[in-house]
Amino acid sequence: MSRMATSEYIGAKRRAYAQADRAKRTRILDDVCETTGYERKYANRLLTGSRKFRERKGRGRTYGYDVAEVLKKVWREAGCPCLPYFKAEVGRWTEEYATQVAHIRPEIKAKLLAMSDRTMSRLLSGEARVKPGWAKGNKRSGRGGRNEVKASTPCASGESVSAHRAPPGDVQVDTFALGGGDPSDNFFWILDVTDRKTQWTVLCPTWNRGQHATLEALEHIEGKFPFDILAIHSDNGGEVLNHHVAAYLGSKAKAPFLWRSRPRHSNDNAHVEEKNRSSGRQLFGEARIDCPSLHGELVRLCDDWSDFRNLFCPCRMLVSKEKRPDGKGCRCRYDKPRTPYQRLLDEHVLTPEQEVSLRAYRAKLSGMDIYRRVLKRLRKIRRIQAAYAKAKHEGKDLSPFAARPSLALRATPSGTDGLHREGTQHAANNQHMSHAEERRMSVQYLANQKTPSYLQSVFSI
């Protein structure tokens, strides 16, 4: 049948189809399908006069444009964290935003609290993460030569004992460079100390990784930890494994256990290596900072950033890791996101006075306020560093950028003609100590240190 004949035939059957009962409609529909060869549902639509599909109306949008805009603003003010971590603390972030930045309507706040991290990811798709770090490209050169302290320090993987079995106070130590990819001349390094059990991390700048500057940074970091340090696990670098630092550790009433990574096993210090990136490089990027006068600003910046990361930023820890049945990769399981502050309180290792003091310190701080202060300090450091680099390139006087005598910068700052080369005396007790005395105390400390009970299965000293 031609198309015109088919159309006339359908038109003739349509009126009879409309007036027929159910049984007659079935027979008419059978005849039309047999005559035209049409599929049964299509023929039924032609006979009833319904030629178009009626699309089903879907469910309306739960989170509209207004909710998405508020989510973007709160997320940016919180420092653009990963969304599972943002979801874990979204209640506190929305409260801080509502009290410090702008009012949030109750219905929008309720939707933000009910939203899943996957929905947040969908609403924030295409949004660029604004991170404080800057610049790219950095390489670290190695060191050679025999180190007596290194040879006397027990050696094992920092992951020999699971982080879940280690008590708070088992820390890992590492440094990373702010040299901008150029290892020549002098510049700042960052000393990074991370507790394995709670993930409590503190950063502090040090000039050129010298033993005196490193010890000052280590003492400053000890004061930022709310609990005692029981053990220090370092890589094989000489900034920590030296007689000066070892003598200081041995002079303490509760001397921590010092041990190190295995040679050529870069993942033995895995927890602090990960924090070098998530806490350190996220802040500084790969920039070069070599202006000596920036030491004080860098200390204050690192203190603020450490408080922000420890008190307000959740993190996850690996619970189990097993190979897949097909042998392709591993299946990793993590615990629920919690801040290092929450993890520390859950361990119940603090005295009542320490816990009250820590809770009071946390209560008077605001995460968004700290983050804005970090960005402000970072802009100031960039401005001073740019002025210093320009003056150095043009051969101008660099004395305005020289370090103050109170800073123990043992190496000569770039272009300062030996200003403040002498540094300060022993940072531990401000008393002069000969190298021979330091070496004697260091050797005695390393020979007599006792292995903690949770590491007995790793060492037999």
Name what the model sees in each region:
Residues 1-231, 236-461:
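Secondary-structure boundary/capping micro-motif
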